Amino acid sequence: MPYEIKKVFASLPQVERGVSKILGGDPKGDNFLYTNGKCVILRNIDNPAVADIYTEHAHQVVVAKYAPSGFYIASGDISGKLRIWDTTQKEHILKYEYQPFAGKIKDIAWTEDSKRIAVVGEGREKFGAVFLWDTGSSVGEITGHNKVINSVDIKQNRPYRLATGSDDNCAAFFEGPPFKFKFTIGDHSRFVNCVRFSPDGNRFATASADGQIFIYDGKTGEKVCALGGSKAHDGGIYAISWSPDSTHLLSASGDKTSKIWDVNVNSVVSTFPMGSNVLDQQLGCLWQKDHLLSISLSGYINYLDKNNPSKPLRVIKGHSKSIQCLTVHKNGGKSYIYSGSHDGHINYWDSETGENDSFSGKGHTNQVSRMTVDESGQLVSCSMDDTVRYTNLTLRDYSGQGVVKLDVQPKCVAVGPGGYTVVVCIGQIVLLKDQKKCFSIDNPGYEPEVVAVHPGGDTVAVGGSDGNVRVYSILGATLKDEGKLLEAKGPVTDLAYSHDGAFLAVCDASKVVTVFSVADGYSENNVFYGHHAKIVCLAWSPDNEHFASGGMDMMVYVWTLSDPETKVKIQDAHRLHHVSSLAWLDEHTLVTTSHDASVKEWTITY
């Protein structure tokens, strides 16, 4: 096999303010699940750097839950499609697909024998359904609510009971199978966000936007108590999760705290303050074995520490929005990956362990369009907030210095030796030296899109939307047009010089990569065909003999310079999402990013 996936650094959960986010637990205790966009992400709970991504939904996925057997996962999307798929094989073969109702699926529950499934949400004609997993035959009706149902759970032993919570401020109680509506529970005064039965089935809890948690008898549905008296939290409660022994309950709230409750004596055991920023609101939680997890509005996943509630054991960071660009850099003998997303967030990853964090301080306020590292070890990034930033990679701190404000929005940035930076903006090319503007070409007569600086430092290539590449010379503090026009096969989308400066590779919207030989006066060396859609990005391998290209067709090709027929094709590198950026860690390791907000490392063998 010429390529192999080496590592997957998965995206964070996709979160929305005021909406609870479900973390699905694994009955075997190894993994946990959540969703982002059209992906379901499975991560190892002990080592979250180990991840797997399921991408077979055509629409945004909202919730995914393991069957109690652990062999299947059911996932539901905004169109009302429920897919049940295999967890034991890498291919995740589809077992069954159902459409219980037309509209967003918000929660899923299985019976303990993994044979029946309840699905609730925002259907047009009904808000829930309960059916056999293998035939889809109905095993009851979910009625009793007049608004969208947010949550459902089923008692995990016989006699079965089912509970739901809805935006009509009520919970409902059902007996079955076949499941029949018994009564409505109207104790809450706001939306009911979450209902959960304890693992032993003796009790169930409801949590609401009114800040209250009520405990009920699991068999009869009678009220037992209100946790914490009149208020369990100062804000709305979005999620609850029982401890494996059914004695304690974990709750997550918009008041930016999570709490552990001793249900038997009705008291708070610990409170976890998660911060003071609005992004620290807690939208989801999971108690699995010894792990207590919560999700913040920032998308970060917190591992809570019972022994030290004020500080999480670890926080999983990353991206929850699409990644636009990446670059790599060696620092202190380690290779790091830097990725920038369309919300202005820049993250750095240890390429071996997947340990990652974001830069401290206030950075870009809009999409990061392009990043590169200059000779002094600074990350140079340009963003739709009309700035170019220079960030020290040893400190990884956005300082007030190192920000260059531009007149128009930058699209691409490239650096050369001697402190030079060239920025391509809308209708403008800007030359910076030592972080200061020294020259600009204001009306170049074409629309510049991308830029590359020759490793020698004296030549700049600018690709335009007119399908041409123009060559400029850096002379002191000016840029001089050399009058050279290199023709690509379509609007130029990216270009790069090989590390030895011998070749310039240009990719375009017409699905072609053209390589020019620099020493021969930029004569055309070779043309590379293979992509089925617009090529977005390219990167040279350190060996100067291979280069990779990624496109809207979700494919990555690794090309051999001397022979266009010798190529490695990575199909569906990021399934359902186009490849947004590429970089090489070494001659055999390629890093790709995509709008699925994940980073992948591939081992390439020739």
From Swiss-Prot:
Record-level GO cellular component terms: actin cytoskeleton; cell projection; cell-cell junction; cortical actin cytoskeleton; cytosol; glutamatergic synapse; plasma membrane; podosome
Claim: Disulfide bond is one of the keywords in the record: no
Keyword Cytoplasm set for record: yes
InterPro entries named in the record: G-protein_beta_WD-40_rep, N2O_reductase_N, WD40/YVTN_repeat-like_dom_sf, WD40_repeat_CS, WD40_repeat_dom_sf, WD40_rpt
Keyword field: Acetylation, Actin-binding, Cell junction, Cell projection, Cytoplasm, Cytoskeleton, Phosphoprotein, Repeat, WD repeat
GO biological process: actin cytoskeleton organization; actin filament depolymerization; actin filament fragmentation; apical junction assembly; cortical cytoskeleton organization; establishment of planar polarity of follicular epithelium; locomotion; maintenance of epithelial cell apical/basal polarity
PROSITE patterns in the record: WD_REPEATS_1, WD_REPEATS_2, WD_REPEATS_REGION
Name of a matching Pfam family: WD40
SMART domains on file: WD40
Domain of life per record: Eukaryota
WD repeats: 4-45, 48-87, 93-135, 138-176, 180-218, 224-263, 270-306, 311-351, 358-408, 432-474, 480-518, 523-561, 566-604
Signal peptide start-end: none
Gene Ontology MF annotations: actin filament binding
Positions of modified residues (Phosphotyrosine): Y238
Family: Belongs to the WD repeat AIP1 family.
The name this protein goes by in its record: WD repeat-containing protein 1
